[in-house]
Regions:
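Bacterial N-terminal signal peptides
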Residues: 5-16
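Secretory-pathway glycoprotein ectodomains that are cysteine- and/or Ser/Thr/Pro-rich
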Residues: 20-302
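N-terminal secretory signal peptides that target proteins for export/translocation
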Residues: 1-3
């Protein structure tokens, strides 16, 4: 969607997945991962919270091995330990607000302050219709800095030139620092509208990167910034890693909560262990010193 009317959208590593029921051992393995690598990284609530319904994730994309690098047989043995770290992503699809919708689930868009929209969670494999409005929430338990790159994807598998859609000075004044419980929402007070001038448009490919230090090659602008395709390709090759994906059971269709609004829209708090969890967790198996890099699909109906 090149630099659309405010139509950007989410990320596109397309996972080839088969969703099936997990046996108890698989469920327990998945629970240990998201419990220790994501939930327990958040702070505990300062005041006791009402007991909530038990929740869990199902694994929908098994670990995908990173391709072997050239001359791998000649490489020296790895010294640094490789471990899994998670990045949480919730894709929200906006719909017209109904009278019964909770007030905190509603949003007035910057470009249309007369109409209210309600945010509903969708799973990462959702296929969108042209013109759908979406927002993103991203959370990283790793302390660091968040970067989000958008590219249009076409039916022949090719991609448009990359654009940095976060950070920008219009969103949080360019502050892209992340930590457990801190939610970054995109775009600031608007929504991405999925559309393109090209007939072979197939959706968006969003690349999400979490680094320990700010990227020296990136200059944050007032708005979206065009990036050098060769630079992005180098990052993707250099930080490629094995990835697993988990979906929150029963999460799709749930609306925005008061806690999510305060953390994401207002930035007045962080989420705790008692608050809602992301709809989708991406588990990246990489060396601790490497940035985390994932892609998330926003696919369109053909």
């Amino acid at each position: 969607m090149q630099v659309l009317w405010f139509a950007v959208a989410c990320v596109g590593l397309i996972f080839n997945t088969t969703v099936c029921a997990q046996d108890p051992a698989q469920e327990e393995d998945a629970r240990r991962l998201w419990d220790s690598e994501f939930l327990k990284k958040r702070a505990e609530a300062k005041t006791p919270a009402p007991a909530r319904k038990p929740m869990g994730y199902r694994r929908v994309a098994a670990k995908k091995p990173a391709p072997a690098k050239p001359n791998a047989t000649d490489a020296k043995p790895a010294i640094e330990a490789v471990e899994g770290e998670m990045v949480g992503v919730t894709v929200w699809r906006l719909r017209a607000t109904k009278t019964a919708d909770a007030q905190e689930s509603r949003l007035l868009l910057e470009e249309d302050e007369k109409s209210e929209w309600t945010l509903e969670r969708v799973e990462s494999e959702t296929v969108f219709a042209p013109g759908d409005r979406v927002r993103l929430s991203i959370e990283s338990p790793r302390n660091g800095y968040l970067y989000v790159i958008d590219r249009e994807q076409y039916t022949d598998g090719t991609l448009s030139n990359p654009h940095l859609i976060f950070p920008t000075l219009r969103n949080r004044n360019g502050d892209n620092s992340v930590k457990a419980g801190k939610v970054i929402e995109l775009p600031g007070k608007s929504a991405f509208r999925l559309s393109s001038l090209r007939e072979d448009y197939a959706g968006e490919a969003l690349t999400v990167i979490v680094t320990e230090q700010p990227l020296a090659d990136v200059t944050v602008g007032e708005r979206i910034v065009k990036l050098d395709p060769a630079l992005v390709a180098r990052w993707e090759k250099q930080w490629n890693a094995s990835i697993e994906r988990f979906e929150l059971i029963g999460g799709a269709g749930k609306t925005y909560t008061k806690a999510e609004r305060e953390a994401g829209q207002e930035g007045s708090r962080v989420l705790t262990q008692e608050d809602e969890l992301p709809q989708t967790l991406y588990r990246v198996v990489a060396a601790r010193s490497n940035p985390l890099l994932i892609t998330v699909p926003l696919r369109m109906k053909k």
